[in-house]
Amino acid sequence: MPDNSFDIVSKIEMPEVHNAVQQAMKEVQQRFDLKDSHSNIELKEKDNKILLQSSDEYKLKNVIDILQSKLVKRNVPLKGLAYGEIIPSAGSTVKQEITLQQGIAIEKARDIVKKLKDSKLKVQASIQGDFVRVAGKDRDTLQSAIALLRGSDFGIDMQFTNYRTN
């Protein structure tokens, strides 16, 4: 019977994203090279999206760079962002939508479970909705599982939480 367990989650702290968006918008408004570019950053918390708008692609890339630097300073993982296409918009502007990924998708969770099973570690991994629970007999095995997963790239940001020992 496994006595120890931990959860693998992928979460983005929305208050930190909100603060980063506000800081980025303030910098965009103050930067000389973006003065008349009609650049805008809008956070839609209910949809987990950030909408970016600017006068052309070059200035949009500058806005993205500013936003990314503010997100990094606030410890928001950039792996949790999914960038949409750059779309021409009304008034000769361009838009881009960034989706904030919350939770682990089923395909990624299956990859994580498969990686743990292929490693021959004595742990049981189970998919629990939008997170993966890993259980094992001793803490050392769980630490090895965490090290193995940190060394692998699944294209998502993973946090290891809810570490339980008996």
UniProtKB/Swiss-Prot annotation:
InterPro entries: DUF520 (IPR007551), UPF0234-like_C (IPR035571), UPF0234_N (IPR035570), YajQ-like_sf (IPR036183). SUPFAM superfamilies: YajQ-like. GO terms for molecular function: nucleotide binding. Pfam families: DUF520. The keyword Nucleotide-binding applies. The keyword Cell division does not apply. Gene3D superfamilies: 3.30.70.860, YajQ-like, domain 2 (3.30.70.990). Keywords: Nucleotide-binding. GO terms for cellular component: cytosol. HAMAP family: YajQ. Nucleotide-binding protein. Belongs to the YajQ family. This is Nucleotide-binding protein Acid_3194.
